[in-house]
Amino acid sequence: MPALVTNKFRIHNAKQFVEAFDEVSYSSGGTVTDSSGLLNTNMYLFIGKVTAWSDDTTPPTPTDAVANTHYENWRDMIAAKKITSADVSHVIPRKNWTNNTSYFAYTHAEANLPSQDFFVMTDEFNVYKCLANSDTTSTGAEASTSIVKPTGTGTSIIKTSDGYQWKFLYQISAADALKFVTPNYIPVDTVRRANGYLANTYDGSPGQNQYDVEVAAGSSGNGAVEVVHLTTRGANYLGETGALGAITNSSTFVISGATFTKDDCIVNNDIYMTSGTQSGQGGTIIDYVQSSKVVTISTDGSGTAVGFTGAPAQSDTYAIGPKIVISGDGQAANVRCTVNSSGSINAVTVVAGGNNYSNASITVVANTNQNQDSPAIANPTAATLTPIVGPAGGHGSDAVRELGGYYVITNARLEYGESNNFTTNNDFRKVGLVAQPKYANGDYATASVVDQATTVVLKSWNGTTYVADELVTGATSGCTGRVVDFVSNNTLRLTDIIPSGNSTSAGYNGVYGYFSNSEVIAANTGGNGGSGASATANDAGSVTGGDLTRFSGDVLYVENRSPVTRASDQIEDIKLVIEF
């Protein structure tokens, strides 16, 4: 049977992952019983694999076999650094605003909206959503190029002179830009929560602007029609702009009427006030006398003009055009239009978006008997307008959901040696995320950094330096490991520990086959491809395992890379992008 896993499902999973870094565990009685097991204190970025791939320029694709995900990645692990909620963000593909480029206009009918270029980031790190472009088709297709960069951080729709309409969504802070912006992705977040601010630090900051947008969007309600796409402009419509003459009352007044050559030719058209106390209001024309230029507007039972709260004043400006009727399952949307000198619709204004529409359509109404009397006026050729229903909550209410934020980025900065937990004398080829690792005593790990190499303090060294990546073997145990580094001529750090299955003696950890505290640990001789270095483990306590119990956590993500060489004066800024 046909089925669909929606983008909302993907975004839900991504949000659950991000929100898990702030979750709190409770017992059935509502008391916090174990904060050590929380995800925000128990997710680590790890590095690993000192040995080369078969081709270091083309690392192999990781597999999800248990042998690899659960075992090999742990054996290769060198060190790990904790990821906190401040190190995680939703991200979306980066789309820089570029002059003379076409952008897709949002439409509720587009099945694969996140794949379209319908939002941009400007050089001020402002993110805008494209709601309309000049000559937008009903499907939102790119019909013209954007030549005016959107600017501003207000809550209203931004209309630029090239015909585009944009909605400001949010601004990326300098701190977030440094941490989460990459050549291919930018961060996205929703700052408002049910109980108000996510944090109380938004006044005058980029977060305040986004909060204002989210609040304004919420006040418009669900299913508002904030934009109308003009598909075909039609022809032979009557309309004009001008200033009112004498006012009789709220429903009767004199207009310019320069282009209206006969009685009632504009009956059923709308008049819309563009200045004065009635600005933004308007009504439907029911009578027009050409000789006196007097129009009459429909009234209610009390004689008050429908659509006006009072009488306009002489010299107030107006626009007359075809009446726009919106049909659908919502309410209160109000749209007006104007026409050009050729009788085609040249602009559409949304006076009120209404709410609760899930579907809507537009009918353009004008007097269809314009040629009934002399002089003849051609009947209009119908225009096609498409009302665009906004997302749940309104444009800007939830940027993560609206822009397809089903990608999550984690960021970790490996600074120098990280208190000697991270080697600066070797490279690595794996980075990944491990959740819920534990210490040897069974507690969940909480340290900010952990050293996962096995450390051996040596004596009786033969003077030959152990070489990074080479294989060493315990003379008694038969256990093998790979050299991470050799420190101060007396400390060997190893990874990829493989105990011997033939050993009959317990190792340092009480398990047969592991390195023991007093055995000789030697590299192969030079003739067999090794350095020939050799030394003896320095008795009791000289061998210690990594800080984390191997195989105790879940490897959630792994990425194979070409070698990354570390140095004592170097910082690695590691960003992992996960798609849900």
Give the location of each predicted region.
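Conserved, function-critical positions that sit in or immediately flank catalytic
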Residues: 162-580
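Short, surface-exposed terminal/edge motifs of secreted or surface/virion proteins that either
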Residues: 126-129, 133, 293-299
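Extended assembly-interface regions of large multimeric machines
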Residues: 1-125, 131-138, 146-195, 199, ...
